[in-house]
Structures are given as structure tokens and as C-alpha cells.
Regions:
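Short loop/turn segments that flank or connect secondary-structure elements
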Residues: 1-228
Length: 228
């Protein structure tokens, strides 16, 4: 059963109501922190990790080693960085004293809540779905808040281009690994580790993310051609 506010798959998300940018959306975060508790499914993008690392003043790899676990997604075959829950509480490692300690740099999934986002890997078009929230309040109807207002306030619009490009590149990399035989290819693990460097770790927090992401992925493709 899908937990409220946390669709378990793209198929589950597609069953939720879809919302256009100009449609009313009156959800307001109440600051209760319920969405931060027992959160074990939060996969980070490279941009998410970079933003957290920059907020902490640490290199991305050190940030991942301290707060995340690394795995290889069974369906996409791609490396994934997942927030590791606090061993004592089971909550997000950045949830302390009933507040997010990295709120300005919170991951996309947190900023979206209770929305789900789907990105078309061919066109980079984004769609948003309303999931059943665990909490929150509602703004008065006369304020006429829309989905676009919510996205703007949560700084999701400002990062949309990076998130779309991330989705497109990850789909292309997944296809590359699948076509090369996936885990049956003896060079899969070295290739996947090299992909992890390009997507997550080979970044300076003193420089902007997107130019580094483009440079990393452009250098990655010829390497994968040789490795696979």
C-alpha cells in the first residue's frame, strides 16, 4: 500500500490527480515535520547532493559518505544515493528539534511534498500530481493560490531546467547500460562507478553545478563507449 504523500512507483503516481500550473492548489506546509519522520525512500539527484554539500561546506563525496547510502537501482542499473535515516530515530538525518537543518537546500522530493513530479525523458516536459498529504493546512479560497505559486515559492521553478536535464541524461545512461547487457556485462560495475562520479561526486561546491554536470557527462560518454 502506498503511504500518503509517497508514491512507490511511477504507476502509482499516475493514479493520482494531475494538476496544471494554473489550477488552484491550496496546500500550505504546517511545519509539523511528519514528512521527515521514518523517511527511508528519499533518493537524491546529483543536484540535490551538491546543494546539501554546499550548504554544509563539504565535498559531495564526503557528504554522501556521512549521510547517505549508495546502491545500484535494480531497474535502471544506475548508481543511486539515498539519504540514510538516523540510526536512533529512523528519521531524516537532517531533521533535528522538529525542524529541517538544511531547509534552504532541501532535496527536490521534500520541496515538492505533497506533489509528485514526472518528467518525460524524450521531451523534458514536466507533470505534477497531487498525492494524499499526511499533514498541512489550507489557504483561504479568496487568496486564489495556484500550483505555479506553490512551485515558485518552493524554488522548484528555479531548478526545473536542471532537474529536467538530469532526468533526460539518466534515462540515456540507463539505456546505455541496458543495451550493453546490464549486470551480465563484466565491465558493468566499473562503468557504474564511473557514472556515479560523473553524476554525484566530481563537483566543486565553489563552482555552479550545471556547467560541471555538462562537462562531466560529455566526458563520460566516450569513456563508456570504451568500457562497455
Amino acid at each position: 500500500m502506498t503511504e500518503p504523500g509517497r508514491a512507490e512507483s511511477a504507476a502509482a503516481l499516475a493514479q493520482c490527480p494531475r494538476l496544471a500550473a494554473g489550477e488552484p492548489f491550496d496546500f500550505v506546509c504546517a511545519g509539523c515535520g511528519d514528512c521527515c519522520r521514518n523517511r527511508r525512500d528519499l533518493v537524491l539527484s546529483g543536484y540535490d547532493l551538491y546543494r546539501i554539500a554546499r550548504r554544509l561546506g563539504l565535498p559531495p563525496r564526503l557528504t554522501a559518505d556521512a549521510f547517505c547510502k549508495q546502491e545500484f537501482a535494480p531497474q535502471t542499473l544506475l548508481p543511486a544515493v539515498v539519504l540514510r535515516p538516523n540510526a536512533r530515530t529512523g528519521n531524516c538525518p537532517f531533521f533535528e528539534a522538529d525542524a529541517c537543518t538544511i531547509h534552504a537546500a532541501r532535496p527536490l522530493a521534500c520541496a515538492l511534498y505533497p506533489l509528485g513530479q514526472a518528467i518525460d525523458p524524450a521531451t523534458a516536459a514536466m507533470e505534477y500530481y497531487v498525492q494524499l498529504p499526511l499533514c498541512g493546512t489550507r489557504v483561504p479560497a479568496q487568496e486564489q493560490r495556484t500550483l505555479q505559486n506553490y512551485l515558485d515559492d518552493a524554488a522548484i521553478t528555479a531548478r526545473a531546467g536542471i532537474d529536467a536535464r538530469w532526468a533526460v541524461v539518466c534515462t540515456q545512461l540507463s539505456d546505455k547500460l541496458q543495451q550493453a547487457g546490464g549486470r551480465e556485462n563484466p565491465r558493468y560495475l566499473p562503468a557504474a562507478r564511473r557514472i556515479a562520479r560523473a553524476l554525484y561526486f566530481d563537483y566543486s561546491i565553489q563552482d555552479d553545478f550545471y556547467p560541471q554536470f555538462n562537462a562531466n557527462t560529455q566526458a563520460l560518454w566516450p569513456l563508456l563507449d570504451k568500457m562497455l
